[in-house]
Amino acid sequence: MTCGFSRADRSPYHGPVTSTVARDVSGVRTYQVRTYGCQMNVHDSERLAGLLEAAGYRRAAEGAEVADVVVFNTCAVRENADNKLYGNLSHLAPRKRGNPEMQIAVGGCLAQKDREAVLRRAPWVDVVFGTHNIGSLPTLLERARHNKAAQVEIAEALQQFPSSLPSARESAYAAWVSISVGCNNSCTFCIVPSLRGKEVDRSPDDILAEVRSLVADGVLEVTLLGQNVNAYGVSFADPALPRDRGAFARLLRACGEIDGLERVRFTSPHPAEFTDDVIEAMAQTPNVCPALHMPLQSGSDRVLRAMRRSYRAERFLGIIDRVRAAMPHAAITTDLIVGFPGETEEDFAATLDVVRRARFAAAFTFQYSKRPGTPAAELDGQIPKAVVQERYERLVELQESISLQGNQALVGQTVELLVATGEGRKDSATARMSGRARDGRLVHFAADDRVRPGDLVTTVITGAAPHHLIADAGVLSHRRTRAGDAHAAGRRPRGVGLGMPAVGPPAGPAQPVGCAS
């Protein structure tokens, strides 16, 4: 669906405004991409940046307030994401009036949901595009400029797998790799399946080709992305045969055979799809990190049933027990929702009990957000805000104490860190650098000026807090890497997908490396 809207005076702001649009010194139009939401959106934003650079735009200078083109890649999971977007759009309205050549585009899940309503709430927006057609952005910008009319284009199904598009990667040392898009589950609180569509999987050959290309550019760590990664393979399975649930485990093992790939992570698995062969692949593949992020959402079986989460608390805890039996030092994290409609104090107590038993390294805890269009929004028993807030605070307090105890147990241990940038907000004040341990924990450490983001160091943990570790005893070893060289030189892997000509069964050559059925 494509619509054009006339460019009358649509801004509610009047009067002269001095433009601060960041035009490149060479006259090239500049861009910014502002991202809300999950890792999938972060990776999609790399694709949007790659598309714009391929079309001749240049990223605005660091610290520039605005650019010639500002793209919002949005989230629709929580109400505060809506409010934040429309608030930021309002802040840009006077700048837009001061420079009519400036363009504003809104994409992602909220755009897929709101469609033309984006223009009704923010009529100074130039382009609205959805989750299925991010490759259309440069064309839509040009069409809006030429026609002097806003363009709304929302596709109802995936037009082109995002990983086949150009990419401007944010990191020289770590990369996202999509293995699937969409979701076949029907959780009552979640709007994502209606916005991202049914699950569509890439073939193993295409995924491994992209990973090899990234490693050739110096990348040390990849994170395999999907709404439900351990359902991988469902879209190219033969419906006439029994479901083969081993495709994701084989993909992990195949990543283990790629020389130069030091770390493999993945997010997020669904407990109902979690099989023992994935645990075995994690434990037996040296470069697969001992880290698991698996959403629990609630510890109450009654609430899980109302959420349409097709597992129960004991099954979830059983998976954790088997993971820890295979990898005793694995860091396990989760997502939790407080205040789902109908949640009683007894239900909440069940969640607290599971959290105590699970001993998560960390938990991303959310207050239930009522989303129009989801079954949960129509349920009776919506919980008063004050009750939700009180339960939320109790849960956070419990989890923070568990996280602190787990981190304190690591004091004195030696860890390997992949040095990162942007992870430590106080690094400049504390003269520390930051990095991630193999289990995903954040460590702030004392280093000298020879250590660069992208390098690997070992150090000893000397202190702990709920959300990070401290290593002030100095660096024990330092390995300079090609990723560190690339970061120092300002180079990023381009990461163009190496062939996503179709979504479907893997080609024949995948079988020898363990990914074909």
UniProtKB/Swiss-Prot annotation:
Its cofactor is [4Fe-4S] cluster. It catalyses: N(6)-dimethylallyladenosine(37) in tRNA + (sulfur carrier)-SH + AH2 + 2 S-adenosyl-L-methionine = 2-methylsulfanyl-N(6)-dimethylallyladenosine(37) in tRNA + (sulfur carrier)-H + 5'-deoxyadenosine + L-methionine + A + S-adenosyl-L-homocysteine + 2 H(+). Gene3D superfamilies: Methylthiotransferase, N-terminal domain, tm_1862 like domain. Residues 169-405 form the Radical SAM core domain. Residues 408-475 form the TRAM domain. Keywords: 4Fe-4S, Cytoplasm, Iron, Iron-sulfur, Metal-binding, S-adenosyl-L-methionine, Transferase, tRNA processing. It comes from the Bacteria. Its EC number is 2.8.4.3. Catalyzes the methylthiolation of N6-(dimethylallyl)adenosine (i(6)A), leading to the formation of 2-methylthio-N6-(dimethylallyl)adenosine (ms(2)i(6)A) at position 37 in tRNAs that read codons beginning with uridine. Monomer. This is tRNA-2-methylthio-N(6)-dimethylallyladenosine synthase. It comes from Mycolicibacterium paratuberculosis (strain ATCC BAA-968 / K-10). The lineage of its organism: Bacteria, Bacillati, Actinomycetota, Actinomycetes, Mycobacteriales. The gene is miaB.
